[in-house]
Amino acid sequence: MKYEKLEPAAIDETVAGLVGWTLAADRLSISKSYKFRNFVEAFGFMTEAALTAEKLNHHPEWFNVYSRVDVKLTTHDANGLTDHDVKLAKAMEKAAARRAD
């Protein structure tokens, strides 16, 4: 699959629309830390996100400790951000919202 890297203006617009996501200084990735009530909620989020990632064939870099999940999204094949990163970030936002206090 060929991935098209987002243009700089599209990156700025995209990140502005993703609440809580941070653009890396090199502009090649976005990241966010999620905090849940407990490990079960965090793992449920990761499971839901993993199923979406499989459907998109686009997988996150992430790290989990108890109720926290740190996520980094980039498209290695494009050496930067693509629409796949945006789709996965939006899906993660929906998954996290379903677990909100």
Swiss-Prot record:
Enzyme class: lyase
Catalytic function, reaction form: (4aS,6R)-4a-hydroxy-L-erythro-5,6,7,8-tetrahydrobiopterin = (6R)-L-erythro-6,7-dihydrobiopterin + H2O
GO BP annotations listed: tetrahydrobiopterin biosynthetic process
Keywords noted in UniProt: Lyase
Protein's UniProt keywords contain Repressor: no
UniProt-recorded Gene Ontology molecular function terms: 4-alpha-hydroxytetrahydrobiopterin dehydratase activity
Family according to the record: Belongs to the pterin-4-alpha-carbinolamine dehydratase family.
Name of the molecule in the record: Putative pterin-4-alpha-carbinolamine dehydratase
